[in-house]
Amino acid sequence: MTSIKHLLINAKKYDQKEFEIKAWVASNRGNTNIRFVEINDGSTIKNLQVVIKKEIMSFLEVDKIRLGAAIHVKGVLKYTPGMAQEIELNADKFILLKNTDEDFPIQKKETSLEALREIPHLRHRTTTLRAIMLIRSTLALEIHKFYNERGYLWVSSPIITGNDGEGAGESFVVDDESKDFFFNKKATLGVTGQLHAEAYALGFSKVYTFAPTFRAENSNTTKHAAEFWMMEPEVAFFDLKDLIKMSDDMLRQVIKRTVEAHPHEFEFFEKNKPGLLKNLNLFLNNKLSILEYREAIKILEKVKDRFEDKNIFFGKDLATEHEKYLAEKHIQGPVAVINYPKSFKAFYMFQNEDNETVAAYDLLVPGIGEVIGGSKRETRYEKLVQRVKDLKINQEDLQWYLDLRRFGQASSAGFGLGFERLIMYITGTENIRDTIPFPRTPKNMKM
């Protein structure tokens, strides 16, 4: 059994050869002499047109086949370059394996993405969601490839944890409904795998985590979800410069290979969002620039009237509109903004000599703004302990992490990549709910 994608890639070579496919019906049309049934097996967004003649199957039976029905077809492939259908299959055998009921909600008439979110178990059978999920799968594979090729260890970070790595306190508590704690202490769903990755970098040198993370943040924006995936590499002996280069190399390779692997899908995305490929090429074809946070503030202050948020000052966390301006208008390419004020950054970031900023960066790209945030880690035990105290974080829960500084952690650096944010960026998807198979958001969990 072969796939439709494989047939498309090898169309010329397979002309006039016989193939057998099992798939689902995407459309059913024709006239009194011939029927055309388009099928899709999920390997690509492109459908395969099956040509059915009367002697193969009664047209009365063909007409009963509804969208979404499972079929089994055997026939001869015909290569038709220059036609609307690059290939078609002339059926010798066409079998209906399972029809759909009349109330099957996926029909030829386009359904809004908002309506499709009500049927997460079926929406991937539409062209849009199929395209996004194909890209999601390839992106994940390419991320693993990038780190595997460079000798990184993949660490399975825990889902259940006893500490809040971000210090934000927006965690889901794990409760077994008994009077006593199951783990003899308060347990939460992890908001990051970074702290555990740091422990493993101290011994394996180069590691990364790629796992679901959870935030109990009551935010109903297009960019937030309660459950999402994070990819977090951590490298011993790296400084900020090394980290920025590695993150830039990773993004370029992963995006380039994914786009190359899915020509039909990206043709579809570009049609839905003109200019998408231009923004991707702005990133791929331009060298990464480095910009000090202080300098970024000065640049933004000069053009503040163009922003909705005009209140720009040193110590402000940049909004998306500010980030997009820096990447799209000022730099016209990717830019890493470095050395942010420590006032709004995490406790574990290395404090610079000015005692006002930390060795942190955000990587901004045209079209979306921030895709990566990272830092060199604070490895001076006394400074880290003081920072924990200043932020009123429970030191007892983090003592194991603090102790890494006493047990050979000379230096370390790492970043976090919101996986769904990356999918949104390269597919032009505007709502994070459409990049996750089964999204979890406030007051909403369908399955």
Curated annotation (Swiss-Prot):
Assembly and oligomerization: Homodimer.
EC number, UniProt record: 6.1.1.22
Protein location: Cytoplasm
Ranges in a coiled coil: none
Gene Ontology molecular function: asparagine-tRNA ligase activity; ATP binding; nucleic acid binding
Main location: cytoplasm
Keyword entries, A-Z: Aminoacyl-tRNA synthetase, ATP-binding, Cytoplasm, Ligase, Nucleotide-binding, Protein biosynthesis
Protein's organism: Mycoplasma mobile (strain ATCC 43663 / 163K / NCTC 11711) (Mesomycoplasma mobile)
Catalytic function, reaction form: tRNA(Asn) + L-asparagine + ATP = L-asparaginyl-tRNA(Asn) + AMP + diphosphate + H(+)
Name of the protein in its database record: Asparagine--tRNA ligase
